[in-house]
């Protein structure tokens, strides 16, 4: 696990060009960003595994997605020489329709339309429909389910606000394959006066 979570020293740790542009837009829109070190670490972890089915919960404006597309479907000639371990299917869950349009453009820019898709629903709707589909088709293999999410999930990245992160993480464990991976930012540690104990 330590190797999986360690920094990839052979990989350029600078922000990919497309992700950098999206980050600038986020700053202008006052949208909070994951720290660059966290985005790079998520990308580094994803470079070491070969997930069949992956999902990003909380696509936002596509900032973290751009980091992962740069890994899995590089568009520059320099990155084009690298071996990619992209998933067979990737679903990006984002309830904001305008953000979904931006993510859809990102998918097309990276020529990932045959394996990546954005779903314009909130996570609670997606998980409810998926669990319902699994329950009503209990006799068939998970991979044959007709659901928004490709099953079973081998990689889940939760990129939501701290208030929503815990509930999303708890609900996703039911869908993760044995040996699958769930990546999310740990809760912020309280600082200052915490009151009487």
Segments predicted by a language model, with ranges:
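Conserved SAM-binding loop of SAM-dependent methyltransferases across substrates and taxa
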Residues: 61-87
